[in-house]
Amino acid sequence: MSTAEPAPDPTNPSTSGLAPTTNGIGSPPPTASAATKFSILTKFLRRKNQVHTTTAQQNEFMQKYMPNGNSNAVQPAATGGQPASSDGGSAIEVPPPKESYAVRIRKYLANYTQDPSTDNFYYWTCVVTVAYIYNLLFVIARQVFNDLIGPSSQSLCRFYNGTLNSTTQVECTYNMLTNMKEMPTYSQYPDLGWSKYWHFRMLWVFFDLLMDCVYLIDTFLNYRMGYMDQGLVVREAEKVTKAYWQSKQYRIDGISLIPLDYILGWPIPYINWRGLPILRLNRLIRYKRVRNCLERTETRSSMPNAFRVVVVVWYIVIIIHWNACLYFWISEWIGLGTDAWVYGHLNKQSLPDDITDTLLRRYVYSFYWSTLILTTIGEVPSPVRNIEYAFVTLDLMCGVLIFATIVGNVGSMISNMSAARTEFQNKMDGIKQYMELRKVSKQLEIRVIKWFDYLWTNKQSLSDQQVLKVLPDKLQAEIAMQVHFETLRKVRIFQDCEAGLLAELVLKLQLQVFSPGDFICKKGDIGREMYIVKRGRLQVVDDDGKKVFVTLQEGSVFGELSILNIAGSKNGNRRTANVRSVGYTDLFVLSKTDLWNALREYPDARKLLLAKGREILKKDNLLDENAPEEQKTVEEIAEHLNNAVKVLQTRMARLIVEHSSTEGKLMKRIEMLEKHLSRYKALARRQKTMHGVSIDGGDISTDGVDERVRPPRLRQTKTIDLPTGTESESLLK
């Protein structure tokens, strides 16, 4: 219900009928409206992430800042719609505040799932592989080679009495650390060496944290990784997470993320100058992601065999690296420079007198020693202690097994890389032997060999059918469409054809290579193919081959009219010119048989092609207009006869079956009639015997026979109606 409007107050310009105008003469200056002020307040509150402004807050704002009191106070609508003001107008609609970035990110991550087949995920696996390689290389190296911890560690703990073993190293470290008063920081170190060490140690900590962050992100992606189910990628968050907890991947991810190096590698109250990088070994169990990256890279690579060789070489380097670190660790555990086998000044092969002992020298010699041992060359100093003998023996055994496997894999990969060349060479050798056996001229033999060389040089030793036959028909059609579709569009008669026919024809195109001087066709030959020039040049010459009429370049088409079998063509299906190859020429060939086999399924396209062919011949004045528009080819006639023979054979087989069935039915009827006839004869004989008449017509004596004997009853038999002529015909049918 509408309420009565209040009486206008002359003292209140907002309610009186004489409200001042905004554009009249002598009108008061314009003031900011309530809507403007309220919108400013709303924006301010929204920026401060305040809650929604209620109707009560709006009224309070109006009463406090508006000079007219609460005459324009906003009241809630009675019908539950938009809030209405006192004058019947609608209140200002406050839009909901925008969500913060944290809320958006939380919602996005709650519904996020990863498709494992995307390119972005492949790039991410490459990042995880880099993090894995970092741990694989430096976990053992930082544990063994102390100088990797910082540039000052070598100057802090030097050789003590010519040697540096584990005991003197611990004492040196303890003496340096006990001189520190508090937890060391960058500014509290007593010398520049310690400050450099601290800075270098923080660099390793930074890289460790960075690689651990990569592992954390990869764990989340594994948690939301989609999976294949019935040929489709399942990406529902609930199903994906359930599949993750049911798999073994979550155990691997959890073990690889245990921060043992952070828990046990930072003693308190001082920092261990060496640390415990070996506690990061649990990061190395995440090898599955690296294997997936290598497999997908091999699949994507255009040179998969070369990539396999690189991977095998990398495996060899990793094995040698770890073995080198183990050698130096044993040398350090025994004592550097204590005998001629370990690293030190007594081992003249490792540290001659004129060579300075540096980190690079230590690692290079250890890597060299490991390479010689694992390759079973063995030109290294002989071991002295029992543990040295045991380590060398174990290394030699592992080297024989590992490198025998690696060499076998490398040999198989190299043989696979040369498999195509070997197959091609075998074909060429067979042709050479055949030509030598058949006494082929030397000039022709040279041409054949040059043709083979051209095929191998231009990588055309394999045909398209051999390469693509492993793919399904759909993928073969898509590849052929991308390779040959535009080429086929250049043919005049195919320009307006439907895409389905062109998709059929691109699969029929075959590549042929012609040598210099070869005639593709000669005048008067029967045309069975059309040609499209892919590469090279062709010349149209006279019968002598001396005069050149025209030169055909790449993309030219000829012979298309001869395979259409157009009725009324004055040339018939004969070639009208001599076409010769100038150099090596690659041609796409489409045969007449393949074209007409494809046109059977496209009758409209067939009519269109024939109409275009007639127009072209008519334009060149090579068409007999009185001839029928369509003429059957010999193949079509033969096919029609074959179809007629098949129809006759089918009808004959059906008639034979019907005859056999009818004959069987008639034989059954004849047998039944013979049985009934024999029964009638027996009854007739019995009746004649009862009346004293023999079958031969003589009387039979009835003396001594009781006259009251009743004659035997005749057995009721079924009457048999012989079929009429119409019924017999229907029966035969």
Curated annotation (Swiss-Prot):
GO biological process, one term: thermotaxis
Annotated region (Disordered), positions in chain: 1-33, 67-95, 694-733
List of residues binding Na(+): 379
Statement: the UniProt record of this protein carries the keyword Transmembrane helix: yes
Residues with site note (Central gate): 403, 407
Superkingdom of the organism of origin: Eukaryota
Annotated 3',5'-cyclic GMP binding sites: 559, 562, 575-576, 619-620
Residues engaged in binding 3',5'-cyclic AMP: 560, 575
Subcellular location: Cell membrane; Cell projection, Cilium
One Pfam assignment: Ion_trans
Annotated phenotype, changing residue 407 to A: Impairs activation by cGMP, likely by disrupting the central gate. Impairs activation by cGMP, likely by disrupting the central gate
Residue intervals annotated with topology Cytoplasmic: 1-125, 218-251, 288-308, 412-733
Gene3D superfamilies linked to this entry: 1.10.287.70, 1.20.5.300, Helix hairpin bin, Jelly Rolls
Biased composition (Polar residues): 12-25
Entries under InterPro entries matching the protein: CLZ_dom (IPR032406), CNG_cation_channel (IPR050866), cNMP-bd_CS (IPR018488), cNMP-bd_dom (IPR000595), cNMP-bd_dom_sf (IPR018490), Ion_trans_dom (IPR005821), K_chnl_volt-dep_EAG/ELK/ERG (IPR003938), RmlC-like_jellyroll (IPR014710)
Extracellular side: 149-197, 266-276, 332-362
Tissue: Expressed at the sensory endings of thermosensory, gustatory, and olfactory neurons.
Function: Pore-forming subunit of the cyclic nucleotide-gated channel. Required for normal thermosensation and chemosensation sensory behavior. Required, downstream of receptor-type guanylate cyclase gcy-9, for CO2-mediated responses in BAG neurons. Required, downstream of receptor-type guanylate cyclase gcy-14, for alkaline pH-mediated responses in ASE-left (ASEL) neurons. Involved in the development of ASJ sensory neuron axon during late larval stages and in the maintenance of normal axon morphology in the adult. Regulates dauer formation.
Assembly and interaction partners: Homotetramer.
PANTHER family: CYCLIC NUCLEOTIDE-GATED CATION CHANNEL SUBUNIT A
Name the record gives this protein: Cyclic nucleotide-gated channel
